[in-house]
Structures are given as structure tokens and as C-alpha cells.
Amino acid sequence: ADRAIKFPHQVVVEQRSSVGATRSLTAGELQRQVEYTACGLIGLGVKSGHTVAILAPTSYEWLLLDLALLSIGAITVPIYESDSASQIEHILTDAHVTRVFTATTQQAELVRSVRPSFTLAVDSFDQGAIRKIARAATDVTIKDVEKRRAAVSSSDIATIIYTSGTTGNPKGVALTHANFVATSEGARQVLGDVIDSPETRLLLFLPVAHVLARLVMYV
């Protein structure tokens, strides 16, 4: 939001389509899309404090959902694409996940198979999850989003990130909004000139389920 105010016309995201075409988004455009997505999530019934998991590769959709969820006080729970069925089941149960967004139908089916009796909404990008969110935004206003955003405290949990689980079940680490603000400010103190330069281009290939990739996205 800060950058959207200071540099609304600066390109902050470049995404490449399956046919190789590149689409650029400015800070102002990204903010508007995040707000609209947040409206849709509220329309779908996502409440403050709800845990919402994302099982998908690094993508614009991941960024969009994450920022929208954080802006309305929900908690993002990343799931690695490489996680096993038992690890996914553990994460869903341990974090009390209420909704999951996946990249593919196959991933959605895997989630449903490990928690068949679990009250859980599952949507995949390849089956129109983003369009579903957009439709749900119809009766929600930006003022509703602003009200939810104003109620978010720096001490509120922003995300629960799970370890790889190499020595047992994955262990969840809760990070607050203040945690991310502190690390982002630290990064900007060292790399501020690079981060704010319109000439800077960064290729993010890390899985966004990793905390370092999240930090890179935020700064």
C-alpha cells in the first residue's frame, strides 16, 4: 500500500503467460486487484482469523491471494507442492484450515482425499477459483475491506509456515504482521536503493511456501 501511494505507476510485477507474453502491473494496479480480491474473499465468507491454505507454485495468483488475505485479517498457510498426503493432512488439521486454494484440479482432489469428512472449501485456479472470487465480490465494497484492514493489529498472526517435516510431522511457525514489517524494514535499510529503483528486476524462483520468498515478494 505504501508503494502504491508513493510510486503508483512503477511496475512491481511482471508475469509471463503460457505462450510467453509478458504482462506488467504497476503498484497502483496491483493494489486495486488486491482490494478487489479481498472483497471477493469476504464475499466467500472468509473471516478475520480464518486460516486459508495455498497449495500452488510461485505465481501471481499466490501473491494476489496472500496480500488479499492479509489485508482482511485472515491467516495464510502455505503448503509445499512437494508435501506428501499425510503432511498435507497434518497441516490442514493442525492449523484448523477453513479453505484451500490449489493450482490444479489434481492438487484439489488430493486435499479432498486426505480430509473427506473435514468441513473444508477447496478451489483450484485451473477450475476458475479467481473467477469465483470475483463473482463473490459483487456485494462487498472497498469500505468493507478498509474496515477489516483497520482492525488488523501488528501483533495478529499473518501466516503459519510449516517446516519440511524431515524428522517427523511438519511444525508450524506463527509469524505476526509485525514480524514481516520488521524484516521488510531491515531489508529496505540495506537494499532500499535497489528495491525502489525502476530498473531493478528480480526473478523469484523459490517456492512461496518458504519464508524468504515471502519476504522478497513483500519488499
Language model features by range: what are they?
Residues 24-28, 158-184:
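Conserved AMP-binding A3 loop
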Residues 50, 81-113, 183-203:
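Conserved ATP-dependent adenylate/AMP-binding module captured primarily in the ANL superfamily
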Residues 9-67, 84-89, 175-178:
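Conserved AMP-binding/adenylate-forming core of the ANL superfamily
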Residues 73:
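Structured binding elements
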Residues 56-67, 82-86, 105, 206-219:
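Conserved coil-to-alpha-helix start sites within the AMP-binding
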Residues 19, 106-154:
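ANL superfamily adenylate-forming
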Residues 9-11, 140-162, 169, 195-201:
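Conserved pre-ATP/AMP-binding loop-to-beta segment of ANL
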Residues 31-36, 154, 173-194, 202-205:
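Conserved structural elements of the adenylate-forming
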